[in-house]
Every structure is written in structure tokens, then in C-alpha cells.
Amino acid sequence: MGGISIWQLLIIVAIIVLLFGTKKLRTLGTDLGESVKGFKKAMADDKSQPQDASFEKVEAKEAASTEQKAKEKEQA
């Protein structure tokens, strides 16, 4: 009763096609599709790179080097 019927949706689509034209709507759809593909690819690339593991390795190296420096100072 309060919803939009299929006929009302068809009328809205027809008005949009008349206003913008099919060529402009096609290019808009293509641009939108490419944007979504790029976003999905970026999200997949972000998940595949384990940033925490490399961060721990750097911390371990820094801790080892500071311990070596402390031992060298004690020996001197």
C-alpha cells in the first residue's frame, strides 16, 4: 500500500534515461564498476600483506642491537 510498485520504478527509470541519455548512463555505469573493482583489489592487497609480522621482526632487531650496545658499554 505504501511501497513503490514496479510501474512507478519503470516510470522513474524512463525519466532518468530521457534526461541523461543512454550513452552517459553507460559511461557512468562503467566508471562505477571500475571504481568498485579497484576498491576490492585494494582491499584484497591490503589483507594479503602481513604488517604485524614484519613489525615484530623490526622490534626484535632493534632490541638485540640495543642489548649489544649495552654490553659493549659495560665492557669498555
UniProtKB/Swiss-Prot annotation:
The cellular location(s) given in this protein's UniProt record come to:
Cell inner membrane
Which InterPro entries does this one have?
A: TatA/B/E (IPR003369), TatA/E (IPR006312)
Biological process annotations from GO: protein transport by the Tat complex
Quick one: where's region Disordered?
43-76
- For this protein, the parts annotated as crossing the membrane are 1-21
The protein's UniProt keywords, in alphabetical order, are:
Cell inner membrane, Cell membrane, Membrane, Protein transport, Translocation, Transmembrane, Transmembrane helix, Transport
Q: Does the keyword rRNA-binding apply?
A: no
- Molecular function terms from GO: protein transmembrane transporter activity
GO cellular component annotations, sorted alphabetically? TAT protein transport complex
Give the source's domain of life in one word. Answer: Bacteria
Quaternary organization: The Tat system comprises two distinct complexes: a TatABC complex, containing multiple copies of TatA, TatB and TatC subunits, and a separate TatA complex, containing only TatA subunits. Substrates initially bind to the TatABC complex, which probably triggers association of the separate TatA complex to form the active translocon.
Family according to the record: Belongs to the TatA/E family.
Q: Show the NCBIfam families listed in the entry.
A: PRK01833.1, tatAE
Q: Give the matching HAMAP family.
A: TatA_E
Supply the name of the protein: Sec-independent protein translocase protein TatA
Q: Could you tell me which species this protein originates from? A: Actinobacillus pleuropneumoniae serotype 5b (strain L20)
The gene for this chain is tatA
